[in-house]
Amino acid sequence: MEINHDYRVKLFDELGFERKQCTECNQWFWTLDKDRTTCGDSPCDEYSFIGNPITSKKYTYNEMVKEFTNFFDEKGHTPVKRSPVVAKRWRDDILLTIASIAVFQPWVTSGLVKPVKNPLVIAQPCIRLNDIDNVGRTGRHLTCFTMGAHHAFNSKDDYKYWTDKTVEYCFELMQRLGIDGKTITFIESWWEGGGNAGPCYEVITHGVELATLVFMQYKKIGNDYEEIPLKIVDTGYGIERFAWASQGTPTVYESLFSEIIEKLKEDAGIPEVDEKIMAESATLAGLMDIENVGDLRVLRQKVAEKIGMDVDELDKLISPLEYIYAIADHTRCLSFMFGDGIVPSNVKEGYLARLVLRKTLRYMEKIGISMSIKDIISMQLENMKEIYPELSAMKEYIMDVLDAEEKKYIQTVNRGRGIVERMAASKSEITLDDLIELYDSNGLPPEIVKDVVDDLNKKGKKTIAITVPDNFYTIVAERHEEEKPEEVVSTKKELPELEVSKTELLFFKHPTQVEFEAKVLKIVEKYVVLDKTLFYAEGGGQKYDIGQLNDIEVMDVQKKNGIVFHKVSDISKFKEGDTVKGAVNWDNRLKLMRNHTATHVINAAATRVLGKHVWQTGSNVDTEKGRLDITHYERISREQVKEIERIANEIVLSKMPVNSTFMDRNDAEQKYGFTIYQGGVVPGDTLRIIEIEGTDVEACGGTHCSNTSECGYIKVLKTERIQDGVERLEYSTGMGSVSEIASLEDTLIDSAEILGIPNDQLPKTVKRFFEEWKEQKKTIEELQKKVGELVKYELADKFENVGNYEVLVEQVSGTPNELMSIADNLAVGNKLIVLMNENDYLLCKRGENVELSMKDLIRNIGKGGGKDNLAQGKYSENKEQITEKIIQILNK
């Protein structure tokens, strides 16, 4: 469709704004200044607020949040609480909250759910890591920023306001702050994002963009646009930029973190830098519209020229201060990440949090800050507690996770040298892909990799090329920032699309009913589709019900698009239009109900024991056992497992009612928060809420007990670390727990009988046997070492000279460990050892001066694998044939 948007609004006519075209960039803009020829934005105009505040008073960040919110509150906008910076809490397409409108996507913006208030105002903290390498260097970039926004959701039945009022509000707010109206320009622009589009104004003053006013009204389909029924006012005001412009500091960082910056400078012993230098750098950065690291190098050169200083001297002077700016920004970002419950890991939002944390730790090391990162983040929490008290409430978790992560980082750095050396041994260049692999797989920052390679180049025989891009962290963050849907491999045949009404789910109204009558709507292969059913279809981690339809076995139950498919053992017994009698297997259903309710109980107990950061990442509810996956930053200890189990059974014995209600989505979120989505994001404007009184509330479509006592005894069977940052708890309920406890008791009694001791002596006896075994193992290892030394002398005369190497190929009687001990004694200098035993075991080991890869060698003379200096496997040819092959390889 053709779009011709008129950017003229009522305010422009009333106040005499003129529409002009910028002589520098050719963009159209509106201004009160009749003499203006440029649009006002950088790089067409430079920053003119540095050292020259543009408001009638200076505002701190906290004051600006209040000023913005109060203004729109007065204008009839209801203030709403911020959402977490973890967008994954309510949507499954992005990991972090990147804009205020993200809070209302996809449910409100699609029209499926009404907004919680309309119109509304919000000050939403956001995180974007696509410019993380620019933070500290340009004077304006932040990883964490607050988007002040007023939103109006206009429909035919509920129209609020559109372009006229939006522009009027913006201009009035800026004038109330004391900004000269003649300095304000409204640039005509166009916005697209998330499949939507619309015209917008970029609101500029003194060279800096302070707000964007978007009028979301189109859906983008390919290269075309289609009008959407909901017309959305989507504004974004840069709260930090308003505070910066009101203070006129050299960079945005001084306006936000002045106290922290001063303490970090003092701690690191960094000399004062002339404010004019930093102001010049920030001003030129604005003029250059920094987008990449190449621009940053040019920026440094331009600043040096402007102030008459050598570029290397300038770099030495301001780089430490730029690191401090980045540390101040990153620690605020981490305060929100961890305060909103992110658990560091090697995937998804946990990966991004760890990236920011390790980059911060590296910068702290680089400039010699002795203050701990916990101290810095404690200052951030203190500064923000007036506006964000909920972050301070998470301080204990934040401090614990920082401790755990700092230890992991130190361990990573300590083992990093060996990892890099092994990679470098077979390479002439460490590429960007290598650096990313070392970071993703081993957590090694690229700066450490470069330090190791530089050392190797000084000592080694060859030169290994390496270049660390200045935007390395931006590159890896962008690879991980978007949520990628997990690939689900299903062994089940895809269910067909059917044009029949959705199946009525009777078990919601009648959870204990087991028999019903229904009409057959469709027969599809082995599936029967009914108009209503008591059978629960597999979903939400819970297994399907089993039972009978007209005495024919129901083997599987699945659901697609609200239609339930019943797989039966004999489809020939059913016809479309028939009325059938169904019966759910109650014993099977009861086991599923117990285990599903227990899942909620254990999740609540784990949260009490481990902390509010605990978040369910998956579950599996079967008849025999249940499984719950939760986020946690370290292994769950035995004592913690016992406490989780104790609390869970306390809840069971308390006979807490389990209530099921259907609620409006907004009402549920407002009442209970986003923790209702522990089991995953649930679509629709109405949610089924399962509330265990005083214990747990979740949006859930599963079958549950009527009170917790019906679960019976809950037994946590085991825990395991299924991935970094995720713990799995496996448990049983009721008679399943009785069986598990009986099995454990049998194991205990059988073990005691084998050892011929009373049950209560088992731990003590096993400990004694274990200590004795360790001593015997140590003795055996010492004997093996001595045998190896003796065999060394026996084999010393059996080496043959082949080219530049001394080669030994020998069949030796012994275990793999014994052969390894022999090879360790012999493999020095230019010696190459190949040993075989009577069980077809093959071992290849080289001395430090042998360049041939043992991994490659073993593949040519047998089967196996390993590393360049050591390989193990199997052989099938005799000693003479293997020797001949080795000679041929070495003589090539």
From Swiss-Prot:
<keyword id="KW-0694">RNA-binding</keyword>
<feature type="binding site">
    <location>
        <position position="704"/>
    </location>
    <ligand>
        <name>Zn(2+)</name>
    </ligand>
</feature>
<dbReference type="InterPro" id="IPR018165">
    <property type="entry name" value="Ala-tRNA-synth_IIc_core"/>
</dbReference>
<dbReference type="InterPro" id="IPR009000">
    <property type="entry name" value="Transl_B-barrel_sf"/>
</dbReference>
<dbReference type="InterPro" id="IPR050058">
    <property type="entry name" value="Ala-tRNA_ligase"/>
</dbReference>
<keyword id="KW-0436">Ligase</keyword>
<dbReference type="InterPro" id="IPR018164">
    <property type="entry name" value="Ala-tRNA-synth_IIc_N"/>
</dbReference>
<dbReference type="GO" id="GO:0000049">
    <property type="term" value="F:tRNA binding"/>
</dbReference>
<dbReference type="GO" id="GO:0005524">
    <property type="term" value="F:ATP binding"/>
</dbReference>
<keyword id="KW-0820">tRNA-binding</keyword>
<keyword id="KW-0963">Cytoplasm</keyword>
<keyword id="KW-0862">Zinc</keyword>
<dbReference type="InterPro" id="IPR018162">
    <property type="entry name" value="Ala-tRNA-ligase_IIc_anticod-bd"/>
</dbReference>
<dbReference type="Pfam" id="PF07973">
    <property type="entry name" value="tRNA_SAD"/>
</dbReference>
<comment type="similarity">
    <text>Belongs to the class-II aminoacyl-tRNA synthetase family.</text>
</comment>
<keyword id="KW-0648">Protein biosynthesis</keyword>
<dbReference type="GO" id="GO:0002161">
    <property type="term" value="F:aminoacyl-tRNA deacylase activity"/>
</dbReference>
<dbReference type="InterPro" id="IPR018163">
    <property type="entry name" value="Thr/Ala-tRNA-synth_IIc_edit"/>
</dbReference>
<dbReference type="GO" id="GO:0005737">
    <property type="term" value="C:cytoplasm"/>
</dbReference>
<dbReference type="InterPro" id="IPR045864">
    <property type="entry name" value="aa-tRNA-synth_II/BPL/LPL"/>
</dbReference>
<keyword id="KW-0030">Aminoacyl-tRNA synthetase</keyword>
<dbReference type="Pfam" id="PF01411">
    <property type="entry name" value="tRNA-synt_2c"/>
</dbReference>
<feature type="binding site">
    <location>
        <position position="596"/>
    </location>
    <ligand>
        <name>Zn(2+)</name>
    </ligand>
</feature>
<dbReference type="InterPro" id="IPR022429">
    <property type="entry name" value="Ala-tRNA_lgiase_arc"/>
</dbReference>
<keyword id="KW-0479">Metal-binding</keyword>
<dbReference type="InterPro" id="IPR002318">
    <property type="entry name" value="Ala-tRNA-lgiase_IIc"/>
</dbReference>
<protein>
    <recommendedName>
        <fullName>Alanine--tRNA ligase</fullName>
        <ecNumber>6.1.1.7</ecNumber>
    </recommendedName>
</protein>
<keyword id="KW-0547">Nucleotide-binding</keyword>
<dbReference type="GO" id="GO:0004813">
    <property type="term" value="F:alanine-tRNA ligase activity"/>
</dbReference>
<feature type="binding site">
    <location>
        <position position="600"/>
    </location>
    <ligand>
        <name>Zn(2+)</name>
    </ligand>
</feature>
<comment type="function">
    <text>Catalyzes the attachment of alanine to tRNA(Ala) in a two-step reaction: alanine is first activated by ATP to form Ala-AMP and then transferred to the acceptor end of tRNA(Ala). Also edits incorrectly charged Ser-tRNA(Ala) and Gly-tRNA(Ala) via its editing domain.</text>
</comment>
<dbReference type="InterPro" id="IPR012947">
    <property type="entry name" value="tRNA_SAD"/>
</dbReference>
<keyword id="KW-0067">ATP-binding</keyword>
<dbReference type="GO" id="GO:0006419">
    <property type="term" value="P:alanyl-tRNA aminoacylation"/>
</dbReference>
<feature type="binding site">
    <location>
        <position position="700"/>
    </location>
    <ligand>
        <name>Zn(2+)</name>
    </ligand>
</feature>
<dbReference type="GO" id="GO:0008270">
    <property type="term" value="F:zinc ion binding"/>
</dbReference>
